């Protein structure tokens, strides 16, 4: 998956999610995920997650990420609960290393983990009857400063 220079996200159509089954992806952050955008460097980019009807800025859960000056990728639980935005740093991962990211909705909680890294978080967001897959998004307010490639394979 490539986010092109000057954009926030690749072109994609919304995908509905049926049931409460886990989302699993093998994710590899490539060296192109290193970037410098000045004062907005602390903004959190989005990787994948679940948005609930009517809008993901009401209730949603996503893995977030940003490049760290220590040459790692900071990973976040990034979510909206009843229209209020929250985020919590849950760990760091290296570049050019495949990781399995899992999001498991269950009742009013979503468990987020990265296998083999000891990274784990529980996010309290209530689901609605209708849900849709949220894909990669660069930003905050800034667009991608160059092509950003993240290798993503749904498992």
Model-assigned labels for residue ranges:
Residues 122-155:
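Flexible glycan-contacting loops in extracellular carbohydrate-active proteins
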Residues 71-75, 108-112, 119:
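Hydrophobic residues embedded in beta-strands of well-ordered beta-sheets
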Residues 84-89, 117-123:
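Surface-exposed loop/edge segments in extracytoplasmic proteins
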Residues 75-100:
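Short, aromatic/His-centered strand-loop micro-motif at the edge of beta-sheets
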Residues 25, 97-106, 110-114:
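Short tryptophan-centered beta-strand motifs in secreted/extracellular beta-sheet-rich domains
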């Amino acid at each position: 998956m490539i986010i092109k220079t000057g954009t926030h996200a690749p072109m994609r159509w919304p995908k509905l999610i049926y049931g409460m089954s886990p989302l699993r992806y093998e994710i590899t952050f490539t060296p192109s995920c290193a970037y410098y955008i000045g004062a907005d460097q602390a903004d959190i980019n989005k990787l994948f997650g679940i948005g609930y009807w009517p809008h993901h800025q009401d209730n949603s859960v996503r893995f977030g990420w940003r490049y760290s000056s220590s040459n790692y990728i900071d990973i976040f639980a990034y979510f909206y609960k009843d229209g209020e935005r929250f985020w919590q740093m849950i760990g760091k991962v290296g570049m050019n290393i495949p990781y399995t990211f899992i999001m498991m909705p269950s009742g009013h909680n979503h468990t987020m983990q990265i296998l083999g890294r000891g990274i784990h978080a529980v996010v309290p967001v209530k689901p609605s009857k209708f849900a849709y897959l949220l894909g990669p998004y660069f930003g905050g307010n800034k667009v991608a400063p160059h092509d950003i490639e993240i290798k993503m394979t749904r498992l």
